[in-house]
A protein has these predicted regions:
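Aromatic-lined carbohydrate-recognition surfaces of secreted/lumenal glycan-active proteins
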Residues: 203-206, 233-234, 276-289, 343-346, ...
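Catalytic and substrate-binding clefts that recognize carbohydrates or anionic sugar/phosphate headgroups
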Residues: 5, 63-199, 206-207, 213, ...
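Short, well-ordered beta-strand segments enriched in hydrophobic/aromatic residues
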Residues: 26, 34-36, 73-80, 535-538, ...
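Aromatic-lined carbohydrate-binding/catalytic grooves of carbohydrate-active enzymes
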Residues: 193-350, 389
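Catalytic core of carbohydrate-active enzymes
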Residues: 367, 386-394, 408-412, 416-426, ...
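Beta-rich accessory regions
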Residues: 529-531, 549, 605-797
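Solvent-exposed beta-strand/loop surfaces of large extracellular or lumenal domains
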Residues: 47-61, 304, 562-582, 688-716
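A low-complexity, Ser/Thr/Gly/Pro-enriched, surface-exposed linker/loop concept
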Residues: 4-5, 29-68
Length: 797
């Protein structure tokens, strides 16, 4: 195959790390990662597979003890016992050292593994939960990656089936060091590549028969309402679907529907002019029929009788078909302006070659083909098993529009990190069936801000669009705010995009990665870290009738936490039920957090796909913090060679000083000068008089503004990106109180409960009594449980 389809690999392990017997080979890749092979003919596999690319780990420290019963292998992490016979539950075991559990931390070959789960192929037609596959981390300290049946990657870029009857397992025995387990999984299977910047913005997607005219009218309306999008997803009606039955169903197609899109190049050009990128849906399964405009060329290439219009069968097991598939079906469309492809493969995991999953073939080659002109590649398709993280982005499928589906998605996305799959794209708002529920749509869109990809989607039902103006005013406002905020967060998201590649940590990080020994970290299934600076717990249940707030259980680790929406300050080290109205969901920055965003006035696609002239930086007090903003050209693979620029930011709580260091690296990639809007959270009004700003050591006048309602000090500085900026305030201007009386009044004022009860509650809250006394007296009133819960949150935060 062509050079572009050949993958860089280094599959041969160091011989010093191998223990080889007549029919087995044990390879100690690390002191916690063991490859276990058994083959009756004593021939073992040293080539790369579709899952595993790199076995060239450094030399491992281990020792072997041989006795009459077989061998024992010791590392600092593991104790392996093997009788040197065919793998069996009584003959092969590995124990995790470190006293993780009384009896659960020993694995016997063939036993079912109980890990923290991974992900699934799809959520198609799912209402609620779905069974998940395995990950590489477990509370018991170990998990298994079975590579026995994956295809072999050949040097020429193609694949071949593995020899049957072999065992090829990777034992991950990292105890509770989940980060290291994941890091070595990426070391073994390849890194997650960076996404182009535009992918982190909002995607508009709908299964609907748009035309060029109607689509551009819709985009104009979004612009009028300041609702930004960076990606246009054109579902299957871009191509001919109403074909002569002799050509099949029209489900598969590659020829533009000229009635809807008379000039495709013009249409795609208009989207590009807006700063948008485009993906087209393709269902490859039915091959190429005689009605397609490229049929004759494709048929000739494949040796098909084109005069008789015999169909070109979709054969992903054929390298000849795959090369022609791209040459004739996709490259011409890309020349017209298509940026990447939505591979909508729904026909299962079988093809002509036993064990070869067509979905994997399409994902693998589409991704590689997409980078042939030097751009940063991307594809959009379902998950095809371990190793699929190398082909972002994942399409999770056609979910039902229900609260049950929303409630499962944060957990589903979080556990995917356990198998390294960090870029799921869900149908935000759900796809089909279910019911219309304005509140559900608002909450789903809010979750979309804090999911890997924000892609609104819906079915072709005339009643099932996700345009915000289709919903009640409060939902419309919540959706619009969410879509704008997603674009605001692109500088932060792009830095996390790089972190995912460089540091092997996906955007969505389970709580137990940071706190593996805290039982609470495993209990909050829908709570996670969203990058390095935020902790999210999306709302996935309806509001409580009468109180008009929804309840979410949140675990606050030790420290001080700030809700980025409400400004509430929380003491950590506890579990707490928190309540939110429709305007926000629980998202927290830890004390010392630094959140770098785009300016609210520069959210259109043309602005957010480039490195910004204006940055908004939110700084949260009471602890030291640091953040390094990452930037590059946003679209090439230059990041692999280190072509980038970073800007370090640091906050010192003791000095109450925030410092932006000069940009470091290839500064031609960013503006020469920038405007920084520095937002110091939770400040008293006195802060405005105490702020001092210096640029390169020289004190300068800066524009200061105090937001009294939200208790923020906003300092605006214009400076060269090559300069050092320092802002000093005074830590005695940090507003520590939560304005309890005001918050309780605002809640009670909107609550649909009795006036007498409101007066009694508010009178008690403003009585000046100690919090513990107020709580006990409220309890004695036998209030509704949820009403008491709301008041408890405000009083005890």
């Amino acid at each position: 195959m062509q050079e572009i389809y050949r993958v860089k690999t280094s599959p041969v392990a160091l011989s010093d790390n191998m223990i080889i017997g007549e029919k087995y080979r044990i390879t100690l890749l690390t002191e916690a990662l063991v490859r276990l092979e058994y083959s009756e003919d004593g021939v073992f596999e040293d080539r790369a597979t579709q899952t595993v690319l790199f076995r060239d780990f450094p030399k491992t420290d281990y020792h072997v003890v041989r006795n009459a019963d077989g061998i024992e292998v010791h590392t600092s992490m593991l104790h392996l016992i093997y009788n040197e016979k065919e793998f069996s539950s009584h003959g092969l075991s590995i124990q995790i050292k470190g006293n993780l559990s009384a009896y659960h931390s020993i694995w016997h070959y063939g036993e079912k593994v109980h890990d923290l789960q991974g992900t699934a192929r799809t959520l198609d037609d799912v209402n609620g939960e779905v069974e998940l596959g395995h990950g590489v981390v477990s509370r018991f300290g170990y998990s298994i990656l079975d590579d026995s049946k994956s295809q072999i990657l050949l040097d020429d870029g193609w694949i071949e089936p593995r020899k049957k009857g072999v065992s090829d397992l990777y034992f991950f025995g990292y105890g509770h060091d989940y980060k290291q387990a994941l890091n070595d999984f990426y070391r073994l299977c390849g890194k997650t590549p960076m996404l182009p910047r535009y992918a982190l913005g909002n995607w508009w997607s709908r299964y609907y028969k748009y035309s060029e005219e109607s689509y551009m009218e819709l985009m104009d309306k979004f612009d009028e309402k300041n609702i930004p999008f960076t990606v246009a997803v054109i579902d299957m009606d871009w191509h001919q679907v109403d074909v002569d039955p002799k050509y099949g169903s029209g489900w598969t197609g590659y020829t533009w529907n000229k009635k809807l899109f008379p000039d495709p190049k013009r249409f795609l050009g208009k989207l590009h002019d807006r700063g948008m990128h485009t993906t087209l849906n393709v269902h490859p399964a039915d091959g190429v029929q005689g009605c397609e405009e490229m049929y004759v060329d494709m048929a000739k290439e494949m040796g098909v009788d084109y005069e008789n219009e015999d169909p070109v069968v979709c054969d992903p097991a054929s390298p000849k078909f795959m090369e022609a598939y791209f040459k004739y079906l996709h490259h011409p469309r890309e020349a017209e302006g298509v940026d990447f492809w939505w591979i909508d493969w729904q026909q299962g995991s079988n093809c002509k070659v036993e064990g070869l999953d067509p979905l994997w073939i399409f994902n693998h080659f589409h991704y590689l083909d997409n980078k042939r002109d030097g751009r940063r590649p991307m594809t959009f398709s379902r998950y095809a098993g371990p190793g699929s993280h190398r082909y972002p982005i994942g399409f999770s499928g056609d979910t039902h529009i229900t609260w049950e589906s929303l409630d499962f998605q944060p957990y589903f996305t979080t556990t995917a990190t356990n198998i390294g799959y960090g870029w799921w794209s869900h149908d935000i708002g759900g796809h089909m069936l279910g019911y219309k529920d304005d509140e559900l749509t608002a909450r789903w869109t809010q979750y979309g801000i804090f999911s890997p990809i924000m892609r609104l989607h819906s079915s072709c039902s005339e009643f099932n669009g996700k345009e915000p103006w289709r919903f009640k005013k409060e939902t419309e406002e919540a959706m619009e705010a969410a879509l704008r905020q997603r674009h605001c967060m692109i500088p932060y998201l792009y830095t996390m995009n790089y972190r995912s590649y460089a540091e092997n940590m996906p955007l969505i990080e389970p709580m137990y990665y940071e706190y593996p020994e805290n039982a609470e970290a495993y209990e909050v299934k829908n709570q996670y870290f969203f990058g390095s600076q935020l902790m999210a717990a999306p709302v996935t249940t309806p509001r409580i009738k009468g109180l008009n707030v929804a309840k979410t259980k949140v675990w606050f680790p030790e420290g001080i936490w700030y809700d980025i929406y409400t400004g509430m300050r929380y003491d950590g080290g506890r579990m707490l039920e928190v309540y939110r109205d429709l305007s926000s969901i629980p998202v927290f920055a830890k004390a010392g957090g630094i959140l770098v965003c785009a300016d609210a006035d520069e959210l259109d696609a043309r602005s957010v796909i480039k490195n910004p002239d204006v940055l908004c930086v939110r700084v949260f007090p009471e602890a030291d913090g640091e953040f390094e903003l990452y930037e590059d050209d946003n679209e090439s693979c230059g990041y692999v060679d280190g072509r980038c620029v970073t800007t370090a930011m640091k906050y010192s709580a003791d000095k109450d000083m925030f410092v932006i260091s000069p940009a470091d690296g290839d500064t031609s990639l960013i503006p020469d000068n920038r405007t920084y809007k520095l937002v110091f959270e939770r400040r008293t009004e006195a802060a405005a008089d105490k702020v001092k700003v210096s640029v390169d050591g020289k004190e300068v006048l800066a524009k200061n503004k105090y937001d009294k309602e939200n208790r923020k000090l906003i300092v605006t500085v214009n400076a060269s990106t090559a300069s050092k900026i320092s802002v000093a305030i005074s830590k005695d201007t940090v507003a520590l109180d939560n304005q309890i009386e005001k918050r309780c009044f605002d809640f009670l004022n909107q609550a649909e409960i009795g006036f007498v009860l409101k007066d009694e509650i508010y009178g008690l809250i403003t009585s000046g009594k100690k919090t513990i006394v107020i709580l006990s007296e409220l309890k004695a009133k036998e209030l509704d449980t949820e009403l008491y819960g709301v008041l408890t949150e405000i009083l005890t935060a």
